[in-house]
C-alpha cells in the first residue's frame, strides 16, 4: 500500500507560514491542516492571528475553530483528529499540507508512538486500587519486570509516576521506554519545509503583528472571553497574547505593559520554535527571500514517487 504523502510547513510565528501553505496547496492540489494549538479555539481570532476566509483563497482549512475555549485539548486529541483528516484528504486525491508552529503537534504526526497513551480513568482507578491493596513496592516490582529502564528513573515511593508508567503500558501495550522512541510514522511519506526569516526581520514582523492585534481589538476579545465564562486557569488562556492580560484586568499593569510583554514573550517563543524544528535533520530551510524556491521544492516533492 502506498504511503500518504504529506507536506509539513513549519517555522516561527509571524514567519509567513500561512501564506506559503495556501500558495503550496494551490500549486500541488492540496488542502491545509492547521497545526496550531491555539487556533483550534473558537472566538480566539485576534490574539492567535487566525487566518481569515479571504486569506484562505478558497483552499479548505481544517483544525481551526474546533474547540470551545473552556475545553481542554491535548496533543492526543489533535493527532487523533488530524490523522482522520489526513486520510480523508488523501483519499480524495489531494495532498495534506500541514502548517503551524506547535512542535508537539507536528511531532505527534511524524513520530506517533510517543503520543500513543492518553489517560484512562478506569485503568487509573484500577491501578490505584491495586496500590492501596498491595502498596508501592508491588507497583515498583511490576514495573521493573515490564520496563527496567524506566523503573531505574523512578523512586520506588513515587506513586504518581509508577501509576502513570503502568497506565501507559495497560492502555497501549507498550512500555514508556518504547513509547519514548521516535519511530517515524510508517503510513506517511513526509516532506518538511521550514521558513525562517532573519532574526531582525522576524522580530520586526512580530512587533508589527502585536501592534495590529491591539488596533484590531484584542483587549475587547479577551474581555469577551472572560464574560462568556472562560477562566484564566483554562488551557486556552495560557496562550501568548491572552495570559499577559491578566494583570491588566486585575488593575496591576497598564495596557502598554501588556503589549510589551506580548512582544517579548512572542520573540522568546519564536526562538524556541526554531530550536524545535532543528531536530528534523531531513527538513529543508529557507529564508524569507526564498519563498519561490521553497514552493518549487514542495512541488518537486509532491510530484516524485514515494521515498525516491
Regions of interest found by a model, annotated:
Residues 1-308:
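Phosphate/pyrophosphate-binding catalytic cores of soluble transferases and nucleic-acid-acting enzymes
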Amino acid at each position: 500500500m502506498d504511503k500518504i504523502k504529506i507536506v509539513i510547513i513549519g517555522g516561527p510565528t509571524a514567519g509567513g507560514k500561512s501564506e506559503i501553505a495556501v500558495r503550496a496547496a494551490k500549486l500541488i492540489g492540496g488542502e491545509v491542516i492547521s497545526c496550531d494549538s491555539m487556533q483550534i479555539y473558537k472566538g480566539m481570532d485576534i490574539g492567535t492571528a487566525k487566518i481569515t476566509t479571504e486569506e484562505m483563497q478558497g483552499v479548505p482549512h481544517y483544525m481551526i475553530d474546533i474547540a470551545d475555549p473552556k475545553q481542554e485539548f491535548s496533543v492526543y486529541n489533535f493527532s487523533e483528529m488530524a490523522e482522520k483528516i489526513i486520510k480523508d484528504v488523501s483519499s480524495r486525491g489531494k495532498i495534506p499540507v500541514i502548517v503551524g508552529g506547535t512542535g508537539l503537534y507536528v511531532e505527534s504526526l511524524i513520530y506517533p508512538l510517543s503520543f500513543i497513551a492518553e489517560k484512562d480513568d478506569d485503568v487509573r482507578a484500577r491501578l490505584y486500587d491495586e496500590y492501596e491493596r498491595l502498596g508501592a513496592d508491588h507497583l515498583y516490582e511490576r514495573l521493573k519486570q515490564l520496563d527496567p529502564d524506566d523503573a531505574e528513573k523512578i523512586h520506588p515511593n513515587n506513586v504518581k509516576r509508577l501509576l502513570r508508567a503502568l497506565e501507559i503500558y495497560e492502555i497501549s501495550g507498550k512500555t514508556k521506554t518504547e513509547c519514548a522512541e521516535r519511530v517515524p510514522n510508517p503510513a506517511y511519506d513526509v516532506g518538511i519545509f521550514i521558513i525562517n526569516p532573519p532574526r531582525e526581520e522576524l522580530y520586526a514582523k512580530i512587533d508589527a503583528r502585536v501592534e495590529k492585534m491591539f488596533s484590531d481589538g484584542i483587549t475587547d476579545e479577551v474581555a469577551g472571553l472572560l464574560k462568556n465564562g472562560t477562566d484564566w486557569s483554562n488551557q486556552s488562556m495560557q496562550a501568548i497574547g491572552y495570559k499577559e492580560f491578566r494583570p491588566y484586568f486585575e488593575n496591576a499593569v497598564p495596557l502598554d505593559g501588556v503589549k510589551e510583554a506580548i512582544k517579548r514573550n512572542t520573540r522568546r517563543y519564536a526562538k524556541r520554535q526554531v530550536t524545535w524544528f532543528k531536530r528534523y535533520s531531513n527538513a529543508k530551510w529557507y529564508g524569507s527571500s526564498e519563498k519561490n524556491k521553497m514552493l518549487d521544492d514542495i512541488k518537486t516533492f509532491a510530484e516524485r514517487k514515494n521515498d525516491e
